Design a protein with these regions (language model features):
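Single conserved hydrophobic/aromatic residue that forms the stacking wall/gate
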Residues: 1-12
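Active-site Tyr-X3-Lys motif and surrounding loop/helix of classical short-chain dehydrogenase/reductase
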Residues: 16-19, 23-30
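Active-site helix of classical SDR
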Residues: 40, 76
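Alpha-helical segment proximal to the catalytic Tyr-Lys
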Residues: 45, 89-90
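Residue(s) in the substrate-gating loop at a strand-loop-helix junction
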Residues: 60
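Active-site loop immediately N-terminal to the catalytic Tyr-X3-Lys motif
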Residues: 67-71
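SDR active-site lid
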Residues: 90-153
């Protein structure tokens, strides 16, 4: 099912939580939360004694709001962003820089792996970021000591506005974008 929003942008209809295999959900949580936490821990333990290092954790703009039909994904990415912000503060003064890279839609193999390839065409071309540009932005922002890196003018704007809007309104907008209406 597809939905047209007021702006005329077609949006996709992703599965809701109870329609997703529980093993798939567990793997997503293990990867986005468990593995990232263990790798961050190991990296920081090696960097702190040296008094220098860089840690760039890949999160998502989905981490900034609840995303119906992407509930587990946005929740795990919220964890990544929150953990990274906390580590950024913990590492202050140690020479270790910690940044969360929070891109929006990026054209990669993720679409085929996540079975969302068919939804790619549902989003306007201007909403897609180039993977090389995203990587460069993340590395640049990390080198500058920024805690959050949000590549792309569209997503920077959405990020700025999302903090100003009531959470209920942001959830509703997210619902429209993911096909839950």
């Amino acid at each position: 099912t597809r939905l047209r929003t007021v702006t005329g942008v077609q949006t996709c209809a992703l599965p809701i939580l109870h329609e997703i295999d529980s093993d798939r959900l567990t793997r997503e949580i293990q990867l986005n939360v468990g593995a990232l936490t263990r790798l961050s821990h190991a990296a920081i333990r090696a960097m702190v004694p040296r008094g220098r290092g860089y840690l760039l954790n890949v999160s998502s703009v989905a981490s900034f709001q609840a995303s119906p039909r992407l509930a587990v994904y946005s929740a795990t990415k919220a964890y990544v962003t929150s953990l990274t912000e906390a580590l950024h503060e913990e590492m202050r003064g140690t020479g270790v820089r910690v940044t969360a890279l929070c891109p929006g839609l990026v054209r990669t193999e993720f679409q085929s792996i996540s079975s969302t390839e068919q939804y790619s065409r549902d989003f306007p071309s201007f909403s897609w970021l180039d993977v090389t540009d995203v990587a460069r932005a993340g590395l640049r922002d990390m080198a500058r000591g920024k805690v959050l890196s949000v590549p792309g003018a569209l997503y920077k704007g959405l990020f700025a506005v999302s903090d100003l809007l009531p959470r209920a309104l942001v959830r509703r907008i997210s619902s429209l974008a993911t096909g839950r209406h």
